[in-house]
């Protein structure tokens, strides 16, 4: 009978919908396993083939865990607030809530089409007021604990989205979402004090099983360093403070640089003789993003502050001060010291402005470039009492001296900045605060939550960059919850990251009207046992959610310090490049492609995009090949953690494999147990597939199943052999397996249980290695047949077995064996001559 995947897949999806085999039970006595994927943003385009890669992998892991006796929570939801939906609503004049529900409906259809074993009774939607009620509640607890505050500051402003971006949302000077240029702009913003948790966010990484790349990225982003704060006297009434990790180089300081945003500049306005020049430079710097001022800032610019003098505390010499946009107010003190002899950026700046360059660590030629050490073994020179010391010795010596002299103190510094939390957009969680002229910022009473996002006539941004909510005077004007006087609601909304910072907790208890999650549910399910997600979220969602979880731990909502016990990541799936030079034959055509598309034309595969027309829609794949083929291929495509390229031809190969499994059913004998002949390959494959799923080596697990099927076609197979195959294949291709399981009578054998409800097969280590082996036999180099002998048989045993073969005995009749060539477990060659 032909494998009719369309009918079979619908049959079993309908059955799963009815019997709910994926329902998780809080408090069950079985050991729990909580497997989590990053919930998707429900875009209008629907799922693309990038989504199924992590979804399928976690589904396989969770299916195996169920079969191993675990009570599994494998939930799904939708991270549905955000700019794309709002922009779509503005363009098409439709409410974003309507768009969101349409998109969620389509995503749900696609997820069920692919046979994922989610617990559909636990679905969450971040735009549901009953969900964001608790997002607002958590924010209010942060406000009450002084972790949320409002301040006017230079922020990242997306010129297209017309809203504020967190530092983490700016990539190479452009908006992470839309790619538009990002500039700096002064705005009043709500902030969250994530910096108060910086040490814990670094230190607790030692207690979790994250892939090393994730840990490294988070440590680098937080950027903890131990150094010294050094006070420099000036010719004004103000001292300045500089943070450095290389206090040993103070004797080499020949200038200082202040950030254009530093408040001292305005204070010194009457002292700075070239103020107009400085003010113009400040204005130019304000139009640049941090990335333009740092990474892209190859040409060092600046203005010397005429009238400001700074005294180097180590040498007593006067050094000049400059204002330059490469110094950011957000890191350190907003003032840096220039050591041009040993920092290339400082050397470039000093060279550009004709400043002295002093060598304080010997070993390089500072007339050509800065001498930067790779280690701390350099010898100090031109450094007073430090001369002759190694850098390693000089750092603590100079630090101690600075502290004793009263112009230095030890300081731990961080690159991490507080989280810019408010957005001047409509489609987000309303911030539940009101501003009262008498009482200041006052929380909306908890019993009034959720503060529901009101309907508006227009989602267009205001000309001054304020939220569309600011135009709704009836909603904005309210009474102060504290004094009853007139007050105004906050009109900014929360960022998209708010709802995703705690969603994993809501899955544990999604219908609780009284608290975000009950202690009973959180104590049972927490922490998440395995969380898989994209590397692009390491310094965004992953860091934010760890921060929120630690706060919830501090106030007693959760019992674990970390939300996720394990974190893995997956590689992107690329599409075929329609502009690849390999697609054309003539050199003229190749040159034309390179001229038009540059280096992109040299890459056979690129990121999928609508503009390139290389996006692969799962609907199209499932329609032609079926969901099981799609699932199998997406796991067979390559190393899970690495980038892979989609190939239609390879999809066909996976379909052929499933066809072979389907047709194999007709060859099954009535022998109940695992056959003796197939026992080694069966037990070996069980071990391989079990280990490979646990280590995300899905491609090699599938290869092992393919090899076993080949053996079955060669050896024949028993019911026990086929049963083992179906159980192992079940997590990968659940629809077809359940159909074969039912057709071959295994469901009846196990009292109506589906394959997914039966125990995962176990292997016998002693049977993973074959007890016998088939060897080729040659007589004087000519093949005469094969023999079966015990594994690792010695030469005498092999020769006797060969001689017992009828064909060999006939070939050596009347001959004398003069030499034996024996390749253990593979071949024996009897060299003969006439007697």
List PLM regions with ranges:
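Conserved oxyanion/phosphate-binding beta-strand-loop segments in alpha/beta enzyme cores
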Residues: 1-36, 66-75, 99-106, 279-323, ...
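Residue patterns forming the tRNA-binding/recognition surfaces of aminoacyl-tRNA synthetases
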Residues: 2, 11, 18-19, 91-248, ...
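Long, charged, mostly alpha-helical binding arms that flank functional sites
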Residues: 3, 224-229, 237, 362-365, ...
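NTP-handling and nucleic-acid-processing catalytic cores
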Residues: 3-13, 49, 135-362, 468, ...
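N-terminal catalytic cores of NTP/NDP-binding nucleotidyl/phosphoryl-transfer enzymes
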Residues: 24-94, 100, 123-138, 244-245, ...
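Secondary-structure transition/capping motifs at alpha-helix termini
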Residues: 27, 63-71, 91-97, 113-117, ...
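Helix-rich, typically C-terminal accessory recognition domains appended to large enzymatic cores
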Residues: 79, 144-156, 410-439, 496, ...
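Long, His/Glu/Asp-enriched segments that create or flank divalent metal/ion-associated functional microenvironments
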Residues: 443-479, 485-489, 495, 776, ...
């Amino acid at each position: 009978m032909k494998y009719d995947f369309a009918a079979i897949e619908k049959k079993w999806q309908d059955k799963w919908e009815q019997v709910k085999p994926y329902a998780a039970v809080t408090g069950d006595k079985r050991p729990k396993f909580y497997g989590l994927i990053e919930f998707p943003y429900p875009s209008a385009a629907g799922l693309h083939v990038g989504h199924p890669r992590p979804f399928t992998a976690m589904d396989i892991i969770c299916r195996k865990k169920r079969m191993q006796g675990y009570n599994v929570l494998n939930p799904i939801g939708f991270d549905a607030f955000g700019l794309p939906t709002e922009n779509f609503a503005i363009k098409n004049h439709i409410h974003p809530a309507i768009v969101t529900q349409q998109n969620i409906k389509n995503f749900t259809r696609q997820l069920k089409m692919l046979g994922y074993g989610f617990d559909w009774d636990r679905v969450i939607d971040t735009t549901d007021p009953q969900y964001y009620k608790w997002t607002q509640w958590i924010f209010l607890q942060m406000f009450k604990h002084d972790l949320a505050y409002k301040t006017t500051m230079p922020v990242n402003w997306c010129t297209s989205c017309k809203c504020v971006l967190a530092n983490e949302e700016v990539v190479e000077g452009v908006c992470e979402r839309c790619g538009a240029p990002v500039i700096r702009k002064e705005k009043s913003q709500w902030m969250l004090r994530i910096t108060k948790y910086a040490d814990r966010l670094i230190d607790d990484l030692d207690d979790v099983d994250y892939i090393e790349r994730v840990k490294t990225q988070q440590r680098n982003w937080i950027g903890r360093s131990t150094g010294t704060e050094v006070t420099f006297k000036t010719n004004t009434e103000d001292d300045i403070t500089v943070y450095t990790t290389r206090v040993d180089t103070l004797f080499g300081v020949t200038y200082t640089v202040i950030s254009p945003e530093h408040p001292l500049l305005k204070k010194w306005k009457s002292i700075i003789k070239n103020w107009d020049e400085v003010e113009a430079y400040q204005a130019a710097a304000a139009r640049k993003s941090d990335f333009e001022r740092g990474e892209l800032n190859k040409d060092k610019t600046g203005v010397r502050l005429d009238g400001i003098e700074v005294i180097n505390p180590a040498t007593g010499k006067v050094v000049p001060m400059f204002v330059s946009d490469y110094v950011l107010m957000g890191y350190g003190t907003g003032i840096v010291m220039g050591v041009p002899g040993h920092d290339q950026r400082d050397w470039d700046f000093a060279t550009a402005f004709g400043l002295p360059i002093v060598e304080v660590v010997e070993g390089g030629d500072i007339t050509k470039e800065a001498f930067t050490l790779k280690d701390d073994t350099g010898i100090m020179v031109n450094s007073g009492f430090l001369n002759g010391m190694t850098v390693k010795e000089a750092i603590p010596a100079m630090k101690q001296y600075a502290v004793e002299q009263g112009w230095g103190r030890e300081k731990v510094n961080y690159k991490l900045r507080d989280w810019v939390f408010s957005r001047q957009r409509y489609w987000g969680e309303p911030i539940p605060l009101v501003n009262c002229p008498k009482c200041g910022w006052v929380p909306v009473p908890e019993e009034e939550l959720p503060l529901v996002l009101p309907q508006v006539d227009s989602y267009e941004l205001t000309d001054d960059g304020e939220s569309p909510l600011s135009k709704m005077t009836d909603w904005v004007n309210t009474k102060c919850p504290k004094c009853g006087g007139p007050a105004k609601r906050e009109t900014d909304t929360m960022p998209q990251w708010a709802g995703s910072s705690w969603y994993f907790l809501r899955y544990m208890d999604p219908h609780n009207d009284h608290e975000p999650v009950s202690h009973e549910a959180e104590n049972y399910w927490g922490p998440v046992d395995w969380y898989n997600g994209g590397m692009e979220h390491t310094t965004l969602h992953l860091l934010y959610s760890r921060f929120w979880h630690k706060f919830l731990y501090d106030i007693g909502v959760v019992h674990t310090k970390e939300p996720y016990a394990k974190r893995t990541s997956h590689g992107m799936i690329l599409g075929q490049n329609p502009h690849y030079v390999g697609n054309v034959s003539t050199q003229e055509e190749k040159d034309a492609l390179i001229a038009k598309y540059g280096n992109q034309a040299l890459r056979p595969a690129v990121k999928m995009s609508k503009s390139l027309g290389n996006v692969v829609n799962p609907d199209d794949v499932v329609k032609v090949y079926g969901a099981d083929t799609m699932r199998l291929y997406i796991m067979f495509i390559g190393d899970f953690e690495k980038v892979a390229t989609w190939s239609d031809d390879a999809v066909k190969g996976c379909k052929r494999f499933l066809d072979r499994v389907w047709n194999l059913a007709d060859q099954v004998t009535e022998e109940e147990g695992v056959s003796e002949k197939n026992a080694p390959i069966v037990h070996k494959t069980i071990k391989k597939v079990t280990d490979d799923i646990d280590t995300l080596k899905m491609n090699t697990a599938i290869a092992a199943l393919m090899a076993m099927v080949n053996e079955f076609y060669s050896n024949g197979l028993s019911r026990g052999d086929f049963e083992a195959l179906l159980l192992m294949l079940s997590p990968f291709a659940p629809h077809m397996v359940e159909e074969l399981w039912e057709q071959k009578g295994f469901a009846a054998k196990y009292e109506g249980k589906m394959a997914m409800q039966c125990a995962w097969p176990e292997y016998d280590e002693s049977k993973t290695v074959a007890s016998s082996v088939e060897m080729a036999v040659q007589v004087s180099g000519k093949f005469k047949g094969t023999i079966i002998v015990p594994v690792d048989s010695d030469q005498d045993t092999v020769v006797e077995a060969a001689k017992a073969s009828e064909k060999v005995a006939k070939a050596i009749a009347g001959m004398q064996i003069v030499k034996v060539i024996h390749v253990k477990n593979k071949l024996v060659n009897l060299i003969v001559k006439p007697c």
